Amino acid sequence: MNTTTETKPQLYLYHISQKIRRGYDTFDSAVVCAESEEEAQRTHPSYLVGPGDSWEDEYTWAKCPAEVSVRCIGTAAPHIDKGVICSSFDAG
């Protein structure tokens, strides 16, 4: 019988936004679930998560995570997983 209990880390909800790339066919903001502000900042609204290196050729969002504004808006319920909850895409 396995008695080890894996504890899920506390996750938070963050509003992320950018004002660098604007106009049609761009994301202006998203709500994401992440462990930290830094992790939220590295989350791309189209579900790319990473260091930001792959963002340079991506013209729908900021060029790098440093250009992303982050605001914590609450704690996530235990059943919510990391990632994009919803995003705002300005279609052309």
Short names for language-model regions:
Residues S17, E35, R71-I73:
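A structural detector for beta-sheet-dominated domains
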Residues R22-F27, D90-G92:
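His-enriched metal-coordination microenvironments in redox/metal-binding proteins
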Residues S46-G92:
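Short, mixed-charge low-complexity intrinsically disordered segments
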Residues M1:
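Glycine- and charge-rich intrinsically disordered segments
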Residues E6-K8, C33-A40:
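A short, structured loop/turn motif at beta-sheet edges
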